A protein has these predicted regions:
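Internal alpha-helical scaffold of NAD(P)-dependent oxidoreductase catalytic cores
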Residues: 141-157, 163, 168-212
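Glycine-rich Rossmann-fold phosphate-binding loop(s) that bind the pyrophosphate
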Residues: 20-21
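N-terminal Rossmann-fold NAD(P) dinucleotide-binding loop
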Residues: 24-25
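Conserved N-terminal Rossmann-fold NAD(P) cofactor-binding segment
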Residues: 2-14, 33, 37-39, 43-87, ...
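Rossmann-like NAD(P)(H) cofactor-binding subdomain of soluble oxidoreductases
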Residues: 96-162
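Alpha-helix C-terminal capping/helix-to-coil transition sites in glycosyltransferase folds
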Residues: 83-84, 120, 174
Length: 212
């Protein structure tokens, strides 16, 4: 854990961001702006090709920012590359079902895809909007079934996305960020990570509090 924390503070950690939409792409830009190397993952070939060509498909994210980010960022559809990153942020959609519950199918599919490629001492954070209990019920078992002990040799956090797309008054950098972790160590790492790119983090006592 100490090595992971220092590598984040020294901008040596490689950040993997899964889901390159209106939540994931601004995070790509912020981590790049602060000096991190970033790998973006998406199942959409067209999005990946556009980003690697320096093109933006999100109205409020200017093309110049994408072109500039290519100095330290690339996008891929190859999820086996998860084993090459230190931090994994899951930013996939969780649209509401007819019963007004978040549909977790994209999260579940992502976890199934990346499970074989997880490695020791990674930090995995869910950003997708969801209901209390999701991180413990969906993410922790996947990590444990891959052979890791959460809080000891693999770390899990939750930080709800707080994007306000296109609002010039608020940006990824300035909107306060709620952060939580499965354990004290997990919270410490999650807070240290976002502290690199967000002006104000708000650590809370548990995953469920952050998910509310």
């Amino acid at each position: 854990m100490t090595h992971l924390k220092s590598s984040m503070e020294n901008k040596e950690s490689i950040i993997g961001i899964i889901g390159l939409g209106y939540v994931g792409l601004p995070l790509v830009i912020r981590f790049f702006e602060e000096g991190f190397k970033v790998v973006g993952f998406d199942v959409d070939d067209k999005k990946v090709d556009m980003l690697n060509a320096g093109e933006s498909y999100i109205k409020h994210i200017k093309q110049e920012k994408i072109k500039s980010a290519l100095q330290g960022f690339r996008a891929t559809t190859n999820f086996s590359e998860i084993e090459n990153v230190n931090v994994i942020l899951i930013c996939v959609p969780t649209p509401l079902t007819e019963g007004n519950e978040p549909d977790l199918s994209y999260v579940q599919s992502t976890l199934k895809t990346i499970q074989p490629h997880l490695k020791e001492n990674q930090l995995l954070i869910l950003e997708s909007t969801t209901y209390p209990g999701t991180t413990e019920e969906e993410i922790v078992p996947v990590v444990q079934n891959a052979g890791f002990k959460v809080g000891e040799n693999f770390f899990v956090g939750y930080s709800p996305e707080r994007e306000d797309p296109g609002n010039p008054k608020f940006s990824t950098q300035t909107i306060p960020k709620v952060v939580s972790g499965y354990s004290e160590k997990c919270l410490e790492l999650t807070n240290a990570l976002y502290g690199q790119i967000i002006e104000k983090t708000v650590p809370v006592s548990s995953l469920r509090v952050a998910e509310m």
